[in-house]
A protein has these predicted regions:
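Start-transfer (signal-anchor) and selected internal transmembrane alpha helices
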Residues: 1-88, 293-304
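Hydrophobic, aromatic-rich transmembrane alpha-helices
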Residues: 53-63, 172-178, 272-283, 348-372, ...
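Transmembrane-helix motifs of polytopic, lipid-linked glycan transferases
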Residues: 58-59, 63, 156-187, 225, ...
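Membrane-proximal lumenal/periplasmic loop motifs of glycosylation machinery
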Residues: 92-103, 117-141, 162-163, 208, ...
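Transmembrane-lumen/periplasm boundary regions of multi-pass, lipid-linked membrane glycan transferases
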Residues: 105, 111-112, 264-274, 293-369, ...
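Loop-to-helix entry region of an early transmembrane alpha helix in multi-pass inner-membrane enzymes
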Residues: 126, 133-171, 209, 349, ...
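Short acidic/glycine- and proline-prone juxtamembrane loop motifs at membrane-interface regions
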Residues: 205-218, 393-394
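C-terminal luminal/periplasmic domains and tails of membrane-associated envelope-modifying transferases
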Residues: 468-501, 506, 511, 515-640
């Protein structure tokens, strides 16, 4: 009771916060019962969830033995205000159309809003029903507020994350900075915190996906919580409160994005290995009882946690066990571990590598190698596991960020502890790195994080096409033309009619037409996703249902042209179109690409369907359930 009641028998801040959250939950229950279809219910649920998350983050800090004094709190508020200004500036200086993975969460937010409009039961049922999917709706619980107050565009969804995700994330990041400082026994705490916290906060790949309306960095809140609760904990005694927080953080990070499992497996394996090694050293020093107690408690906690996790997340676990991801996602595996190492070298950058060397120097000097060893072990194990399936995109780089944060903070400690030697050059190095990091372009094709002025200043011949595509997709100068083409389809498609767009590329795909005027999405249900990725996309029977077919010249092929399927489908269409379709409209994009819209003039025949299907005989032999079975089912339904 001492933690709840003071000497004057007054409630502690923790108790007051818990009571406030409990009262809020009761209020939500009453609103849900009395006004089940109220428009404000889901936003209120979202606000309450964000408050619970922030309260939980504070409790993690308390359990981990981390205290934020006035200086830390002031720094967090100042950096958060800077982040607000940065997002506002960065999002406002570009025209980006959210498509593909970059619109998934926005679409899920709209769908969740529609589900809650039917009542609380329908809303929560819809969220839970997605827990086995690649993209769950768990994050939508936290992002609805303040997204509901915005214009509901792609940019506003990205900006809303500064208010619903970033506060808790910064709190965890600040706590982790302090915790690593404690472990390394940093003496120059002021410079260490300022350098370390600012360095990891401005790391480009921390915010890269958020700038593209992918709130996957939400999962890092729980990753950092896991680090805070385990980095200096050795299971010498059982702490049920700590165990509950570790379990909840692990479940939450997996629900955030399934590929965070690679971090979970890599980190816990590396952590257990480190604990076994340290316990073996204790046993050699004559402390066998303590060593055995550590190992026993770890195994007991691990077995119980794994069993509970399997039960809690069984829909996701069963799908993982039944699905061959390495086969179905082979399209995204562009070179295995060798290419992944290259990506990491480019994404880390020379400046960060220099900082890491400072950290390694400090850890060797102070004979505290556990942190960098743990980080490097987790990094390599997660990388080896992930590249068995695919190579990482910019958003999947987030699963490696916890390891890099440990390495960066070790480097910040090394820099701070030696700051009095060559102080001005070191401070200039830190400031230059921050300015470099905040000016990095955050685009879908970013591999090497570079500022705008560097991208515009250097034009190597072998990267000319890559830079052209990056420029076209990052800042859409052709947005008016895309909107005009989308409007043409809206005006010409009647009730129940659909169109089909053959290109499915980073440069142009159906999502660009569907989402070019958010929050309006009049083409939803009228322009389905296209056919491009082997092992993932099914044979496109939507093409045969379509009144209009949209294609482009030249056909866009910026990603994996050797294995992409859409251009082969388009080649067959070019051969047959004069006998099956007529041209009805053209749209010049102003960048060398011209779109044409073709209207079907003859009924579909079995021979036509089989002509398209035979182009993919090799794929059909490997995935008959995705090709011939789909085609035959469509033919049977249409009496062909």
């Amino acid at each position: 009771m001492s933690t709840i009641l003071s000497e004057k028998k007054t409630l502690s801040p923790w108790a007051k916060g818990g009571i406030g959250l409990g009262a809020g939950a009761l209020l939500l229950v009453l609103v849900g019962l009395l006004f089940p279809t109220a428009a404000a219910f889901f936003p209120l649920v979202s606000l309450w969830c964000s408050c619970v998350l922030f309260y939980g983050a504070l409790w993690v800090l308390h359990t981990a033995g981390v205290e934020l004094d006035f200086f830390h709190r002031a720094a967090i508020i100042a950096f958060w205000a800077g982040a607000v200004l940065y997002f506002y500036w960065a999002l406002g200086r570009r025209q980006f159309i959210y498509a593909w993975d970059y619109v998934n969460y926005i679409q899920k937010q709209f769908n969740t809003e529609a589900a809650f409009a039917l009542g609380p039961v329908a809303g929560f049922k819809y969220i839970i029903s997605t827990f086995s999917e690649d993209y769950t709706n768990f994050i939508t619980l936290f992002t609805e507020f303040p997204f509901c107050l915005t214009a509901k565009t792609g940019d506003s969804y990205a900006f809303a994350q500064v208010f619903c995700v970033l506060p808790s994330l910064m709190l965890m990041l600040a706590g982790l900075t302090i915790k690593i400082g404690q472990i390394l026994e940093v003496k120059n705490k002021f410079w260490y915190f300022i350098i370390g916290f600012s360095w990891v906060l401005t790391y480009p790949f921390l915010r890269m996906s958020a700038m593209l309306a992918q709130p996957d960095w939400f999962g890092l809140i729980f990753a950092f919580a896991i680090l805070l609760l385990t980095l200096d904990y050795r299971f010498e005694k059982l702490e049920p409160g700590r165990f509950v927080l570790i379990f909840l953080a692990t479940a939450a990070i997996i629900l955030s994005r399934r590929w965070y499992l690679y971090f979970v497996v890599g980190y816990y394996f590396s952590y257990a290995l480190l604990l076994f090694v340290s316990s073996a050293k204790l046993a050699k020093q004559g402390q066998k009882g303590l060593a055995l107690r550590r190992v026993r408690n770890l195994i007991l906690f691990g077995v119980c946690t794994m069993a509970a996790m399997v039960v809690l997340l069984w829909p996701m676990v069963s799908k993982i066990l039944a699905f061959n991801y390495s086969d179905r996602y082979s399209y995204y595996n562009v070179g295995g571990i060798a290419v992944e190492l290259y990506y990491h070298a480019m994404r880390t950058g020379l400046l960060n590598l220099i900082l890491i060397l400072f950290g390694l120097w400090l850890c060797v000097k102070r004979k505290k190698p556990s942190l960098p060893v743990l980080a490097l072990c987790e990094l390599m194990l997660s990388m080896l596991l992930f590249t068995r399936v695919q190579n990482s995109g910019s958003h999947q780089m987030l699963l490696y960020v916890p390891a890099y944060v440990i390495l960066f903070l070790c480097g910040a400690a090394g820099l701070a502890e030696s700051i009095e030697h060559f102080k001005i050059p070191k401070l200039c190095f830190w400031v230059f790195t921050l300015l470099f990091a905040v000016s990095v372009r955050c685009s879908p094709l970013t591999v090497m994080a570079l500022p705008e002025f560097v991208i515009h200043a250097f034009h190597p011949a072998d990267l000319a096409e890559y830079q052209r595509l990056d420029e076209l997709t990052y800042d859409r100068k052709d947005k008016p033309q895309i909107q005009a083409m989308a409007q043409w389809l809206v005006e010409h498609l009647g009730e129940g009619e659909v169109a089909y767009m053959i290109p499915d590329d980073m440069l142009y795909n159906p999502g660009h037409l569907r989402n070019c005027d958010l929050p309006n999405h009049a083409l939803d249900g009228k322009l389905p996703d296209s056919f491009s990725v082997p092992g993932t996309h099914y044979f496109p029977t939507g093409f045969f249902d379509a009144r209009y077919v949209v294609t482009a010249d030249p056909f866009p092929l910026s990603l994996a042209p050797d294995t992409e399927l859409g251009h082969r489908f388009n080649a067959v269409f070019l051969q047959l179109r004069e006998t099956t379709h007529q041209q009805v409209a053209t749209f010049d994009m102003g960048n060398g690409t011209v779109f044409t819209i073709w209207e079907r003039t003859t009924p579909v025949t079995r021979e036509e369907v089989e002509t398209y299907l035979h182009e993919f005989d090799a794929e059909n032999a490997k995935y008959p359930e995705m090709f011939s079975a789909v085609a035959e089912n469509w033919l049977a339904v249409h009496g062909l």
